[in-house]
Structure formats: structure tokens, C-alpha cells
């Protein structure tokens, strides 16, 4: 005889607590992969050269060692070991896993997030560490969140290298499925905001 059970009942019976936590995130986002993991960046351009850039960062202390660690990842394609370190068995949209991995390597156990909108942004906001687009006291190592399609939802995240006063320079994982150095006008409309790290 066949019986029918809702998937939530089956999930609670067979999933480990860690798997159940990931399942709850999946349910919150209605299984929408871009909402769950962020869509990464479709940008297939090359990494930018920082030669000649004069950084004029704000007054908050940053973490230059973290930035150097992130820059050493430039050229990685496919996101391994970042998504694997996070606990995924295979490749996912990995921009947030990259940022979390870098923070962990720098000695920070938090924030740790695999999704931009449903994990990363709320963590920074709930800890009083959020700056909206236009925030002008950036520090090396802050997180930068993007809303590519301007629907109010964070789609991508990277690490701030610094600013020259008119542009923000970043290291991003999953930018065209690779780690790259990028830059954006500080007023670029697709910048959703910044996760402000306390070092």
C-alpha cells in the first residue's frame, strides 16, 4: 500500500540537522536557485589591472592580509575549494562561498553564507554592519553586494580591495565562473550595498 507524505515530513525524518538547515533556506527561497545562491556574475571579461590605482580608503580599519589572500585566488575557475569547504558536494553558484572562505581563512568564523539575499545581507544588517550604495567609509575586506537586475534582491557578492575616490575595486568569485579583480563607479546602480567588516 502506498502512502503519501508531504516532503517536509520526509525531510525531518531523513536529513541531518545541517541538511535540514539548508533545506529550510531552500524552502524560504521557493527553490529559486538565483535567490538561494546568488546568480554570480555573467561577466566574461578579464581581470582588471591595479597598476597605478591610488587607493584613498576611509577611516575604518580594514584587513589588507585578507585582500592579499583574496587576490591570490584570481584565476581560479569553477570555485573549488570554496563551495566544497562550505559543505556542498558539487559546484553551486559560489560567489558567497568564496567570500565566506576568505573570511574564514582570515580568522573570522562569521559571517558564513552561501546565499547573498537570504543569508549574507541579513547577517550584516542584523549586526548593524550594513552600508547602502553611496556609503563612503569603505575598508579593505568589506563585502560588496550587487543587484544586477535591479529587483531589490542581492544577486552577487565580492570583497572590497579599496576605492580611489570614484571607483570601488573588488575581488569576486564566480565572475564568469572565475575569481577576478573588477571595478565599478561608486554610484553604479547595481551596487546594493556593503557588508562592513569589523577587524
Where do the language-model regions lie?
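Charge-rich (acidic/polar
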Residues: 1-42
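Extracytoplasmic/secreted proteins, especially bacterial periplasmic and envelope-associated proteins
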Residues: 2, 6, 10, 21, ...
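N-terminal capping segments
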Residues: 41-108
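Aromatic- and glycine-rich peptidoglycan recognition patches
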Residues: 42-54, 131-133, 150, 154-199
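Catalytic cysteine-centered active-site loop
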Residues: 78-140, 151
Amino acid at each position: 500500500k502506498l502512502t503519501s507524505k508531504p516532503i517536509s515530513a520526509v525531510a525531518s525524518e531523513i536529513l541531518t540537522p545541517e541538511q535540514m538547515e539548508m533545506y529550510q533556506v531552500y524552502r524560504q527561497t521557493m527553490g529559486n536557485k538565483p535567490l538561494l545562491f546568488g546568480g554570480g556574475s555573467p561577466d566574461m571579461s578579464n581581470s582588471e589591472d591595479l597598476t597605478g590605482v591610488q587607493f584613498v580608503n576611509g577611516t575604518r580599519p580594514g584587513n589588507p592580509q585578507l585582500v592579499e589572500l583574496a587576490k591570490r585566488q584570481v584565476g581560479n575557475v569553477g570555485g573549488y575549494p570554496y563551495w566544497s569547504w562550505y559543505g556542498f558536494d558539487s559546484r553551486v553558484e559560489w560567489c558567497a562561498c568564496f567570500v565566506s572562505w576568505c573570511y574564514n581563512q582570515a580568522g573570522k568564523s562569521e559571517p558564513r553564507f552561501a546565499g547573498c539575499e537570504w543569508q549574507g545581507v541579513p547577517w550584516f544588517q542584523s549586526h548593524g554592519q550594513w552600508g547602502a550604495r553611496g556609503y563612503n567609509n569603505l575598508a579593505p575586506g568589506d563585502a560588496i553586494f550587487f543587484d544586477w537586475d535591479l529587483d531589490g534582491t542581492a544577486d552577487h557578492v565580492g570583497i572590497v580591495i579599496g576605492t580611489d575616490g570614484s571607483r570601488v575595486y573588488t575581488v569576486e568569485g564566480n565572475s564568469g565562473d572565475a575569481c577576478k579583480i573588477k571595478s565599478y563607479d561608486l554610484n553604479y546602480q547595481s551596487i546594493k550595498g556593503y557588508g562592513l567588516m569589523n577587524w
